[in-house]
């Protein structure tokens, strides 16, 4: 039903949501015409639109585009430079720039622009592992502690020690790719 109707105005104008964020994973194969079509939606909908760099998993290779390539295409297609936005849209990893129209869009380019030093994210996988970074296979086993009756204090100490293993930087586009598929990590 979602694909067959114009549900966006109902959802986006609803009082149920403080803000709606739409994440779009980028492809290096998008033509300027396709990007223009996408920008029409970005301009039309009262949402926070974020562009996410492709992240390879299970040994897959990086397929771009990088932040600089995507920014150049957006500037070319939208007719002008993107400008820095100082407003904050949450506490996540996105950097926000404004299109020439003034509409702010977010960028999450974890491969070509490391933000590890300010990352405040971890994920709890469906099998009870706390994943410290999407781009690394480093995980902390929480489920074993819980199943073995660990106290809340012991669990908190384990989590704190694990968080200290978070890296300040990753190795960039050429780094080893995580082996766990995204569908097993959760999002």
How does the language model describe each region?
Residues 117-187:
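Flexible mid-to-C-terminal extensions adjoining Fe-S/redox cofactors in radical SAM and related proteins
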Residues 1-11:
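Single conserved hydrophobic/aromatic residue that forms the stacking wall/gate
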Residues 4, 26, 134:
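Small/polar loops that bind or transfer phosphate-bearing groups
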Residues 16-106, 110, 144:
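Radical SAM enzyme [4Fe-4S]-AdoMet core and its adjacent flexible, acidic
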Residues 10-11, 51, 121, 132:
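Extracellular/lumenal ectodomain signal focusing on beta-strand-rich modules
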Residues 99-127:
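Active-site oxyanion/phosphate-handling segment shared across diverse enzymes
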